[in-house]
Amino acid sequence: MNQNRFWKQAFSFVLLLLVYGVYQFGNKQAELKQPGEYDDLLSLQQAVSAQRSKVWFNETQFTVYKLLADDTKGSRHQRFLVKREGLPTLLVAHNIDLAPRAPLRPGQSLYIKGRYEWNQKGGVLHWTHHDPRGVQPGGWLRLGEEKYQ
């Protein structure tokens, strides 16, 4: 009977260690995904190579390559090109009717969260703003600690 009790206690101890390990691993994963620390480059690379659209991506770092004229047809969009190693040059269309204009300059580093749409020129990053209806998760542009959403 003592041997049976020993195995029950040993099993309980191992189970407790396993639960603790899973809990700690989950916390470490959450810590990795804090803004500016987690990069969704792989998701974007896969979307580009598979020519997929409507792909939401987490905050990812880019460099402003070129500022373009605003798109003023329909909803107004601040437009600019960004670069990132491992990706083609991408167009960003940031809706300035829903979010503030970001003060950008070429060569500047920024973080973008939004949605990728494939096209033959590489693709467009958009939904870099809140969703006024609260249906989509929404995104942002982030310069330093300042978010434009």
What are the roles of these predicted feature ranges?
Residues 3-149:
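OB-fold and OB-like single-stranded nucleic-acid-recognition modules
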